[in-house]
């Protein structure tokens, strides 16, 4: 499936379709404030395992991040001291990932050997609308090939061509930032 959304005003019906796919255990590709990302509901173990297969990584070795809806949502999944909270408050939403110690509320399949989790609150209304409607964080991992940023990671039509048989939904939110 392929859905075109406008970042400034994503269609609510389309956001609900995306959440329906996620609730059914689907994997999506969506825009962030940097490049496009692959994601799923962090509470769906099978979906997380599918993302691991797609990225050809073992869950215990994965360095996954998740997108939270706001700073108050983070404390349930990561240990945040006052200093880190102040830094996050100054810099989020934005193109940053904060790697923090994981709490035991994080699903086991998301916890790596170092027991850390990357936390993001991107400055992108599409993905933030999805997370808000989903009601819990979204697993996020970059759409990239061997740590090399290439055109297909920022062009939603090329992403769709490459991944349409591997994921359940690609969201076209315009060209990515290639950051």
Regions found by a protein language model. Give the residues of each.
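Active-site-adjacent structural elements in enzyme catalytic cores
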Residues: 1-179
């Amino acid at each position: 499936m392929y859905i075109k959304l406008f970042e400034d005003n994503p269609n609510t019906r389309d956001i609900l379709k995306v959440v329906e796919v996620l609730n059914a255990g689907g994997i999506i590709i969506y825009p962030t404030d940097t490049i496009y990302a692959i994601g799923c509901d962090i509470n769906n173990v099978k979906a997380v395992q599918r993302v691991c297969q797609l990225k050809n990584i073992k869950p215990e070795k994965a360095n996954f991040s998740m997108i939270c809806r706001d700073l108050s949502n983070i404390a349930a999944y990561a240990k945040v001291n006052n200093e880190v909270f102040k830094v996050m408050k100054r810099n989020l939403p934005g193109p940053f990932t904060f790697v923090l110690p994981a709490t035991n509320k994080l699903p086991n399949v998301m916890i790596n050997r170092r027991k850390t989790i990357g936390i993001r609150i991107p400055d992108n209304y599409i993905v933030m609308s999805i997370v808000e409607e989903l009601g819990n964080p979204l697993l996020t991992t970059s759409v990239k090939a061997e740590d090399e940023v290439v055109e297909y990671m920022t062009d939603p039509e090329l992403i769709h061509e490459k991944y349409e048989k591997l994921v359940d939904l690609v969201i076209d939110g315009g060209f990515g930032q290639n950051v």
